[in-house]
Swiss-Prot record:
Keyword Ribonucleoprotein: yes
Cellular compartments per GO CC: cytosolic large ribosomal subunit
Organism of provenance: Lacticaseibacillus paracasei (strain ATCC 334 / BCRC 17002 / CCUG 31169 / CIP 107868 / KCTC 3260 / NRRL B-441) (Lactobacillus paracasei)
HAMAP family: Ribosomal_bL12
Gene3D superfamilies per the UniProt record, alphabetical: 3.30.1390.10, Single helix bin (1.20.5.710)
GO biological process: translation
GO molecular function: mRNA binding; structural constituent of ribosome
Name under which the protein is recorded: Large ribosomal subunit protein bL12
Function, as annotated: Forms part of the ribosomal stalk which helps the ribosome interact with GTP-bound translation factors. Is thus essential for accurate translation.
Length: 122
């Protein structure tokens, strides 16, 4: 069976960010791999451990009662369109932003909690 490479690429171009994210997760699950760039083994192992302590992920745990306000806040934070932001909020718990400094992560947490969302930092 021959692959229609051009057709697959066309479908990927038309897909939303959420659809592409779901695709990556499905591929990771199906083939038991991780979508991460390769790194040098020696120095990178120490750097990853240090970076893990210095960076935080902001996870939307629950939208709460003011879902519309939370969607607007997620749009503002991520720059996503309305449909993608709504999909992200509906898929909670969902990581909204990754690799932030502690100060930036706390600012986003306060912003989301200010509109009624439940947020955790990881």
């Amino acid at each position: 069976m021959a692959l229609d490479v051009d057709g697959i690429i066309a479908q990927l171009k038309d897909a939303s960010i959420l659809e592409l994210n779901d695709l990556v997760k499905s591929i990771e699950d199906e083939f038991g791999v991780k979508a991460a760039a390769p790194v040098a083994a020696g120095a990178a192992a120490g750097a990853d451990a240090a970076a893990a302590k210095d960076t935080y992920d902001v996870e939307l745990t629950e939208a709460g009662q003011e879902k519309v306000k939370v969607i607007k806040a997620v749009r503002e934070i991520t720059g996503l369109g309305l449909k993608d932001a709504k999909g992200m909020v509906d898929a909670a718990p969902k990581v909204i932003k990754e690799g932030l400094s502690e100060d930036d992560a706390n600012k986003l947490k306060e912003q989301l909690e200010g509109v009624g969302a439940t947020v955790t930092l990881k």
